[in-house]
A protein has these predicted regions:
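Exposed, low-structure sequence patches enriched in small/polar residues
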Residues: 27-387
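Extracellular beta-strand ligand-recognition surfaces/modules
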Residues: 1-32
Length: 387
């Protein structure tokens, strides 16, 4: 009966977070009164039913046998969703994503007689998510909040705070080598025995509660592999003329004066992670909260030797060293901590010169011998071996 009466709510609540409403009735009179209170259903009307749209495109370019380039793009706007999705299940943000992927064989740029191979790979991906409503005031459109900013600095700060950006980069060179070897008899110094690989990946993310989150990985590998080709030395083959099988055990003896394979691998791996949480109450200083970081710097080396001294006598030796490149426990951020970065750099170089600090060392040696009983007629039905 009193339509002009108003009920006010103190503060600036977010309607989307209202879970409970309590109604209280107070009797200020001294007399006892009996009342009946009706609370009708409370609901929001005229729900926004604005639709959105999405698009996706792909472009693939092939450069003969040199390589290829692939471009992709994808975007969705607020309000986009499936046909069967409810209004509340549709997108509440604009999403933009694009990527580029390239793969080339650099060896194709050189004459074929050089016999150089260098497969190179690079990829870049970026995703931007822009909410429809201001996360700091979820009843207000973000565009309206940006229009309410009085300076460009305020607009840039609000965009940085409300927009989530994720960037990924990857680069790799795999098994780079010159496939040049000495004909018939490969030599230890042939370029084909050496190969090199390198990869680097980086991920960056910013958002409402994240000033920055960065992870970087490096991996460098060097490989040496030599397998000589030669005829074994058979000193008794021409010396014994008899064709009797009783002489086979001596006549067929041979000696390999070089090992069958020698290999050496060195692998350096480094990982660095850095996370800076955003201080909502102090946006002017992104480093007001403590910086979180973790890192790992390893240098792994292994050696392998396989030598069949004769047809029946086999040797193998393997060793592996896992070492850590020591570094001070400080953030590795040249822009924010220039002095600490120089200390870190000096410490790392000093550790590399000393081949790192060994964490563990493993080695094993195996030998096996098969008695050539098949060369003795009366024992050809038997076998005997040991290792």
């Amino acid at each position: 009966n009193r339509p002009n009466n108003k009920v006010s709510v103190m503060g600036n609540p977010t309607l989307g977070e209202v879970k409970t409403i309590m109604i209280g009735v107070r009797n200020n009179a001294r007399a006892t009164k009996s009342v009946e209170v009706w609370a009708n259903e409370l609901r929001l009307q005229e729900y926004s039913n604005d639709g959105g749209w999405a698009a996706q495109g792909t472009l693939n370019i092939q450069f003969s046998d040199l390589g290829s380039v692939n471009l992709t793009g994808h975007m969705e706007t607020a309000g986009f969703g499936g046909i069967e999705d409810k209004v509340s299940e549709r997108n509440q943000e604009d999403m933009y994503n694009y990527s580029i992927t390239t793969s080339f064989e650099l060896g194709k740029l050189l004459p074929e007689k050089v016999r150089f191979t260098a497969p190179i790979y690079y990829s870049f991906n970026k995703e931007v998510i822009k909410p429809k409503y201001n996360p700091l005031d979820t009843d207000m459109l973000l565009e309206d909040a940006l229009d309410a900013c009085t300076t460009e600095h305020e607009k840039d700060s609000l965009r940085s705070l409300t927009t989530t950006e994720t960037t990924n980069k990857n680069f790799s060179l795999s098994n780079v080598k010159f496939n040049i070897a000495t004909p018939k008899h490969p030599m230890p110094y042939d370029p084909a025995n050496f190969s090199f690989s390198y990869s680097h990946s980086e991920s960056n993310k910013t958002g409402e509660t994240t000033a920055w989150e960065t992870e970087k990985n490096w991996n460098g590998a060097f490989n040496y592999n030599y397998s000589p080709e030669y005829k074994p030395f058979e000193p008794f083959k021409k010396m014994i003329k008899s064709k009797s099988k009783w002489w086979d055990i001596i006549r067929d003896q041979n000696f390999n004066y070089l090992p069958q394979n020698i290999s050496f691998n060195a692998n350096i791996l480094r990982n660095y992670y850095e996370y800076q949480e955003r201080d909502i109450e102090n946006l002017e200083d992104p480093t007001s909260l403590p910086l979180s970081f973790s890192k790992e710097f390893l240098w792994n080396r292994d050696f392998s030797l396989k030598w069949d001294l004769t047809k029946n006598l086999h040797f193998s030796f393997n060793s592996a060293t896992h070492a850590e490149i020591e570094e001070p426990n400080v953030p590795v951020n040249k822009d924010l901590y220039a002095d600490q970065y120089q200390v870190w750099k000096d410490s790392v170089w000093h550790s590399i010169k000393g081949f790192g600090t060994p964490l563990d060392y493993q080695q094993d040696f195996t030998a096996s011998y098969k008695v050539p009983l098949e060369k003795i007629p009366c024992f050809s039905w038997m076998s005997l071996d040991g290792n």
